[in-house]
């Protein structure tokens, strides 16, 4: 009982992680590593579309074919659809089960391999699945308790991250709207011309050349750039005689300009 309590506390301590610490390519790798260590298993966290948010391989079970899925950070659609139909934890699925995470070509190598899938919920919504597996050791009741707690903890973190992302999107959109509202017609025209000059989200431009091309003064372009930069939409740096280096850091400006085209 003491061991179970200790492991439970280690899992719930994951909630103390800030959302900022999850802003990475595989934001849940650290969490998956902890779960794999605590429960003694391999662990994989996927979202509702099968995107791999994080995984930990304590034991090697993948073939080269399956390893490609993990490297691509996306599980096969058929498998994801089947996993999404699980509404309660399915424990100790054998290698013969369609939902086994073990590669079909390695069934003879890991005949006793077991997979457990726990749905991840947050705010009443299905957010993904927690998949854990072992080569030969059955997940007992204590393990299943830890798995249920783990899926709840991950669900809370996923929901927190979604909320954070939504707030960031709203903040960026508000900044764009406020900046657009301060632009005159000529400045709006200048912004559209400037962004068309960029190679993707960044590039070098010469204000005087753009001004002559669209029939406005150079000062209009300078004012427009200053307003966008103060709103946190772009970053600029003078290159002297070579012009100005510009980088868009709030990409929503591209979509916003389409509304005015």
From Swiss-Prot:
UniProt DNA-binding region: 207-226
InterPro entries for the chain: ArsR-like_HTH, CodY, GAF-like_dom_sf, GTP_trans_reg_CodY_C, Transc_reg_CodY_N, WH-like_DNA-bd_sf, WH_DNA-bd_sf
Organism: Streptococcus mutans serotype c (strain ATCC 700610 / UA159)
Gene Ontology biological-process entries: negative regulation of DNA-templated transcription
Keyword RNA-binding: no
Chain positions covered by the region annotation GAF domain: 1-159
Gene: codY
Entry similarity comment: Belongs to the CodY family.
GO terms for MF: DNA binding; DNA-binding transcription factor activity; GTP binding
Keywords noted in UniProt: Cytoplasm, DNA-binding, Repressor, Transcription, Transcription regulation
Listed NCBIfam families: codY_Gpos, PRK04158.1
CDD domains cross-referenced by the UniProt entry: HTH_ARSR (cd00090)
Described purpose of this protein according to its UniProt entry: DNA-binding global transcriptional regulator which is involved in the adaptive response to starvation and acts by directly or indirectly controlling the expression of numerous genes in response to nutrient availability. During rapid exponential growth, CodY is highly active and represses genes whose products allow adaptation to nutrient depletion.
Entries under HAMAP family matching the protein: HTH_type_CodY (MF_00621)
Protein name, as recorded: Global transcriptional regulator CodY
One Gene Ontology term, aspect cellular component: cytoplasm
Subcellular location: Cytoplasm
């Amino acid at each position: 009982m003491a061991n179970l309590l200790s492991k439970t506390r280690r899992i719930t301590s994951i909630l103390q992680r800030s959302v900022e610490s999850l802003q990475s390519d595989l934001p849940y790798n650290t969490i998956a590593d902890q779960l794999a260590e605590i429960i003694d298993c391999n662990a994989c966290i996927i979202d509702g579309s099968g995107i791999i948010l994080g995984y930990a391989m304590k034991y090697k079970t993948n073939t080269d074919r399956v390893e490609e899925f993990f490297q691509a950070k996306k599980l096969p659609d058929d498998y994801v659809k089947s996993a999404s139909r699980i509404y309660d934890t399915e424990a100790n699925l054998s290698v013969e089960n369609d939902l086994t995470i073990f590669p079909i070509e390695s069934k003879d190598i890991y005949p006793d391999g077991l997979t457990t899938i726990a749905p991840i919920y947050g705010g009443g919504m299905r957010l993904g699945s927690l998949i854990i597996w072992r080569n030969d050791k059955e997940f007992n009741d204590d393990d299943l308790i830890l798995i249920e707690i783990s899926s709840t903890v991950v669900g809370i973190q996923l929901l927190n991250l979604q909320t954070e992302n939504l707030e960031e999107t709203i903040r960026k959109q508000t900044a764009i709207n406020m900046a657009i509202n301060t632009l005159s017609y000529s400045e709006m025209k200048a912004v559209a011309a400037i962004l068309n000059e960029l190679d993707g989200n960044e590039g070098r431009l010469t204000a005087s050349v753009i001004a002559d091309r669209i029939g406005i003064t150079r000062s209009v372009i300078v004012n427009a750039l200053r307003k966008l930069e103060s709103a946190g939409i772009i970053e600029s740096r003078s290159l002297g005689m070579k012009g100005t280096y510009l980088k868009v850091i709030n990409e929503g400006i591209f979509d916003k300009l389409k509304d005015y085209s």
